[in-house]
Amino acid sequence: PRSPLYVTFFPTHPRFRYFSSWISQQTFEQLDCGVRYCDLRIAHRPNDNSSDLYFYHGVYTTITVEVHQTELQDSHPVFSHFQGLNQELHTLLISTIKSVFNSKLCPKTDAVTLRSLWSSGYQAIVSYEHNLANCHTALWSHIPYWWANNVRRKRGFFVTGINLTEDLKYICSHPTESLKDMVMATYPTLLGWVREQKPGSGADSLNIIAADFVTESEFIPTVIALNENLLSRST
């Protein structure tokens, strides 16, 4: 949606579709493989007179947010970024989130652990980047997103990210390649870094790792191995 006008044409062309897809499995298939964090971005389509909201990441989905939320009410989707949402649509989205997840939403609290979530029957934490979130105890404040070259952090949740992004010149000069090819070429380095991480409650701990094409590599088993190491240290 924020892309230049000429970019909006690319996904309609078969060649550029290879560079507009960053997953090869549907959400439920990813959950079955062990994925427990989904980065889902929400947008309202331009010139759409309805109140329907869609997921987007350069291109829009055909399924609406409400339908997807209902299907995933027993899972843990995480949304980040809004596009084209006014006050009324934010209110509608918040109402939908609260209606779908209901008592499974963990309210704002000073400290939260997985054990406390289980004991209370909570299954989802929603961080919402809008001032309306201050009016709802079931919504947590915005989780800041920092680039990887900014490592200093304040107390609380935060996200740091590295994006592998192809530009128009790269796409045109590599007609036989795809975004998946680019991502898979970086996986040996990424997995080596993941194996060095320490999950837990320490200041230097890392607890959520998100990546693309996770079912096409050893990413999920590598992350699960970190959890097993954490369990062995705590017993």
Go through each PLM region and give its residues.
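Loop/turn elements at helix/coil->beta-strand transitions in domains of secreted/extracellular proteins
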Residues: 34-36, 74-76, 121-123, 154-155, ...
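Metal-dependent phosphodiesterase/phospholipase catalytic core, i.e.
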Residues: 34, 42-111
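Active-site-adjacent pocket scaffolds in enzyme catalytic domains
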Residues: 90, 94-166
